[in-house]
């Protein structure tokens, strides 16, 4: 019996990492932090790369750490990565916030936190507008390129507009589905095949 194992090989789409690109982990990556993750690259230079894992919620709310938010609706926190886990990052669509770093497609990183707090405390919408993270993901010079060559990641050339969607549990599958039918097969592969 011949089994076609090519369905699990990444076919390079010749997309190079850059700010605003999306990294999608391959299905066999058995890593607590990066397994089945979708990472938004917020910076990529010769010195290294920085990203935020978009689809890993934390069992903690922003309201638990920002006292001014104690009496408003819960604001979820996400695990941005294993580095600087005591540092808050925020991805948003609010171009008017001073000091933001434009990512692309209307997404911005950080900016004046007092302006963000004011926006929230005025009762403005948070869902689909702002996502908060503790920590970030980082790669040293050439480390990410090497991991891509080793087929740990595929870089999506799709727009990152779905990254602010609320359904983060299905985001890895959604990101794979945007890559075409070959990768859609990956999305149906069980996380722990031996338990199937």
Curated annotation (Swiss-Prot):
Gene Ontology annotations for the cellular component aspect, listed alphabetically: cytosol
Gene3D superfamilies: VC0467-like
Top-level taxon of origin: Bacteria
Pfam family, one: DUF179
InterPro entries, A to Z: AlgH-like
Family indicated by similarity: Belongs to the UPF0301 (AlgH) family.
Protein name according to UniProt: UPF0301 protein BF2109
Species: Bacteroides fragilis (strain ATCC 25285 / DSM 2151 / CCUG 4856 / JCM 11019 / LMG 10263 / NCTC 9343 / Onslow / VPI 2553 / EN-2)
